[in-house]
């Protein structure tokens, strides 16, 4: 959904909001009449059942102000705004066996022997500004700045700054090019900008702890669960930045 308000002909405000929702569930039951591969010729095996769910929702909220003005061949266009994006993922898994009958395929008819739940989330907050200048379609200049803050990085490295600038010169609008009738349009252009990448695990900077099974005891050993580091924290993780330079011309 979106809404737009014009405060004056040159100044407009726009807000956008969108949301994506995903839900999935899967239940399986394998009766004893369907043997598994390692039954060594046994025509029947123990029934098994699983239950899985997965959920995701992602929302994006954007607000921008735009200003456009033309004064005697001088055209100015400016944009400023900010965006917020948030996503959460959840999943569950359960496995059961020990069913005494094939007629009740729900987990509570057996013994749940393992399972887990997972949840993760991330957020991105961004601010942006851009100014474009054009003089009679002959000289063009654009400057932009974007700042992004990502929850995936540590507190000291969450923000990345990404400037860009571009310029263009349409030579065919110059008087000294008018005699060259075989060229309809010729423009020189150059640009420089930084882009960022924050595609790392949601908690890559913090480290994670997970539960693992291990054997405890001697002759009458039991399998128990214990917590141990799954990944080590790295608070120095920061935005990956890529510089792009483009120089060229357009001709027709």
Feature map (PLM): residue ranges:
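Extracellular/periplasmic, surface-exposed regions of secreted and cell-surface proteins
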Residues: 1-30, 41-252
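Short amphipathic helix-turn modules centered on a small-residue break
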Residues: 32-34, 38
